[in-house]
Curated annotation (Swiss-Prot):
Signal peptide: none annotated. The gene is ruvA. Belongs to the RuvA family. One of its GO terms (cellular component) is Holliday junction resolvase complex. Has three domains with a flexible linker between the domains II and III and assumes an 'L' shape. Domain III is highly mobile and contacts RuvB. It comes from Francisella tularensis subsp. mediasiatica (strain FSC147). GO terms for molecular function: ATP binding; four-way junction DNA binding; four-way junction helicase activity. SMART domains: HhH1. InterPro entries: DNA_helicase_Holl-junc_RuvA_I, Hlx-hairpin-Hlx_DNA-bd_motif, NA-bd_OB-fold, RuvA, RuvA_2-like, RuvA_C, RuvA_C_sf. Its main location: cytoplasm. Residues 164-216 are annotated as: Domain III. SUPFAM superfamilies: DNA helicase RuvA subunit, C-terminal domain, Nucleic acid-binding proteins, RuvA domain 2-like. Residues 144-163 are annotated as: Flexible linker. This is Holliday junction branch migration complex subunit RuvA.
Amino acid sequence: MISFIKGVLIEKDPTALLIDVNGIGYEVFVPMTTFYTLGDIDSQVSLYTHFVVREDAQQLYGFKSKVDKKVFQELIKVNGIGARTAIAILSGMDSKTLLHCIENKDYALLATVPGIGKKTAERLVIEIYDKLLKMANEIYAQTSGTTTTSQDSQAQQAPTSVVLANSIFNESVDALLALGYKQKDAEKMARSAMGDATTAAEVIRKALQGSIKSKR
């Protein structure tokens, strides 16, 4: 069982990282809420991890905090919710927002996540309600908001050319597809979130936040 990983960030794509640990490269899948907090390529990264073994694959999932890892582990215990859907949930909302959804039984907001319909949302609330409430103090203790990396800061100062804009759009669409959104929906979400964004991470964050707000 690999429950924590610390190494050098070699590759950084939305939802997937490559981390060098003493010469061995580990592919780690992460929710966007963790991706937003990452530093530049070649920087040190530390993540709490959960190792999933299936018949056709072995996958490592990483999280910025132990609390997010615990929430992920509770999510995948819910009937009908696998690791991919759990990652999609924690990409569209942080642990605090998820707790609010559970407390308020906000099925409509939960159903904005790809792969979750109303019935699955209702089952999720029923099965995870007590467990998440017990974790409420840990969840609320986490600092709110996301960390702006030096890479994001530098990107915000750089001019956005047509080529760069297309690259950002395509990368954003690919990330949304990886989270389970359909091609048409992913393109629409990315297009509406582009604005003056200068990084794919910024577009993805706005797209996911826009999806949540539209259901409120």
